[in-house]
Amino acid sequence: PWLSQTNHGKGYIAINETPWDSKYTIDHDDRGTRLQFVWLTSLGKMRYKRVVRYSFESNMDYNRACKIYREYVKETGLFKSLKEKEVNLNKISELQQCAVVHTGIKAHTEKDSRFYSGQKDVIHSFDSVKEMIQKLHSLGSFKLYLHLDGWGDSGYDNCHPDYLPACIEAGGWNGLESLQKSLSTQNDLFGLHDQYRDYYYTAKTHNENEAIQLEDGSVLEHANWAGGRQNYLCASLAPKYVKRNYTEILKHIDLDCVYLDVFSCNEMDECFNPEHLMTRKECMEYRRACFQFMINRGIIPSSEECSDWAMRELVFSHYGPYEFMMKEENAKRMGIAV
């Protein structure tokens, strides 16, 4: 969370030291660019002092701004190098050698989803993915990392957090285990897509009382994704479901990596439900706890974007810089991704 402005070699970097309850606004028009931090309340109140650290220099460009920020994260303990992470995650060096293969098993769209247009389910067996990876090796591919979507029985972005078992129509636990063992034999790495924010009404244990509650007592609801009608699961409860699910998953397969969707990309949530009251800062810590759960089991965690609060745990991300995902493929890019 930092901004920088330069003019003929002079400039500053502004580092948001209290980012939990803040955002920024950008206006970019023919009058120029205007950018500012905006402070938000925390559970309805301005609870603490808000701080932005400005550093002014006469020899400033984006490289220098990045170096100042790097010094800052080392000073404050936000920084942790890959070498340090490799102490607990010994396959990081192997991951660096991999090409990424991103594919899916089952796609299902609920009728109340905004994506629904009458499409049928699409299912690829675990064996077909195993054969695809073997084919890639026969064509000359070396070490691969398989990122697998839609491997749960309900399909991609469906029924979270109650998506188990492994997709029965694709081969079930035996099929997933066979795929994992084949990857291991070929010295490839294997990771699963997972999600603990989108909270679907189709989940067997769905309970609206566990969803994020807004200040007025209402519960946010939409049907933007394939799984249809949903709320947001309060992050204070996410570690419970992570532990429950992976206690079962790890009975069947060994894992090298796990991708916890949206955690490092979407904004922090706050929850006004008195049974699990949560600030945005606490939300951040609960999400970190989910990453740490993986680390404690030797599983490399990843998520959607490179956010500094998560860098002590995250090893890699899938959509950094995320901004390019929000525009047409050939649209003009905005600024320099640093």
Please place each PLM-identified region on the residue numbering.
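Carbohydrate-recognition beta-sandwich/jelly-roll modules
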Residues: 1-145, 151, 158, 168-170, ...
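Glycan-recognition surfaces
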Residues: 8, 199-240, 292-338
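Alpha-helix boundary/N-cap detector
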Residues: 57-60, 64, 237, 282-285
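Aromatic-lined carbohydrate-binding/catalytic grooves of carbohydrate-active enzymes
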Residues: 90-243, 251-258, 264-276
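Alpha-helix-loop-beta-strand connector modules within alpha/beta enzyme cores
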Residues: 179, 284-294
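Catalytic metal-binding/acid-base residues of hydrolase active sites
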Residues: 263-264, 307
